[in-house]
Amino acid sequence: MQTQDQALEVAKVLTEALPYIQRFTGKTIVVKFGGNAMTDTELQNSFARDIVLMKLVGMNPIVVHGGGPQIGDLLKKLNIESSFVDGMRVTDSATMDVVEMVLGGTVNKQIVSLINRNGGQAIGVTGKDGNLIHAKKLTVNRKSPEVQASEIIDIGHVGEVKTINRSVIDVLVNSDFIPVIAPIGVGDDGASYNINADLVAGKVAEVLQAEKLMLLTNVAGLQDKSGQVLTGLTTGRVDELIADGTIYGGMLPKISCALDAVKCGVKSAHIIDGRVPHAVLLEIFTDSGVGTLITNEYSA
């Protein structure tokens, strides 16, 4: 049984959340689910409960998920070798079959099942369903120091988003379902393409003109050169941090995706620590949050 102090603490939390619930009711929140949160049972369950609660208080959560480690595990079991170019998995036809099995099958349905078990109504789709994600082949240009020129590297069925068919998402949301999207696109020729989940989440947020884009990561947020988390940034400041080398390496594509989304009309982007239970709720419903908030200069 709760003590009075414990009950008061619960009331305090709910009171702090109230203005945020009022502010974001009816708004679309795109959440990219990835990293440790996808492989830890406690984090999986807390994420699912967060999404269900968002829906229950009137928000429209859209989930986009990754699955790189799970793809790697199955490729290893099948003795299919993997290689990477600039952080992207080279995806031949055999690898693409595995990507579709893992992203469109195992991982997508696990997330849908988790949300549904926690009281939500989720439906899983890939970008091939209803031509949700129209993709084009991604080309990689790499400079060759030997000849002082660029060479085009073929990395197979790796794509980028050409267009998003928002009507598919609208049908699900208007029917009170929570869409769970696997980042597999379809090309003009019907071929499947493996697309970075952060990029898909960003493009979905842009097309829907979402209130928020939230990217779960394995770090506490964007850090400065001394290791301190930068809790609030404008798009202009992010550009400066990219230019001076503060943002680099694996964080650069994620930040660029968030930056592009905000510049294209998404109200705010959040780089949040997916290792923290209930990170999504903490970022939306508390004053302190658990990551880095990026907003446009004119709306900061």
Swiss-Prot record:
Substrate binds at G67, G68, R89, N194. GO terms for molecular function: acetylglutamate kinase activity; ATP binding. GO terms for cellular component: cytoplasm. GO terms for biological process: arginine biosynthetic process via ornithine; L-arginine biosynthetic process. Keywords: Amino-acid biosynthesis, Arginine biosynthesis, ATP-binding, Cytoplasm, Kinase, Nucleotide-binding, Transferase. Coiled coil: none annotated. Pfam families: AA_kinase (PF00696). It is an enzyme of class 2 (transferase). It is found in: Cytoplasm. Its EC number is 2.7.2.8. InterPro entries: AceGlu_kinase-like_sf, AcgluKinase_fam, ArgB, Asp/Glu/Uridylate_kinase, Glu/AcGlu_kinase, NAGK-C. Pathway: Amino-acid biosynthesis; L-arginine biosynthesis; N(2)-acetyl-L-ornithine from L-glutamate: step 2/4. NCBIfam families: argB (TIGR00761). HAMAP family: ArgB. Catalyzes the ATP-dependent phosphorylation of N-acetyl-L-glutamate. Belongs to the acetylglutamate kinase family. ArgB subfamily. This is Acetylglutamate kinase. It comes from Saccharophagus degradans (strain 2-40 / ATCC 43961 / DSM 17024).
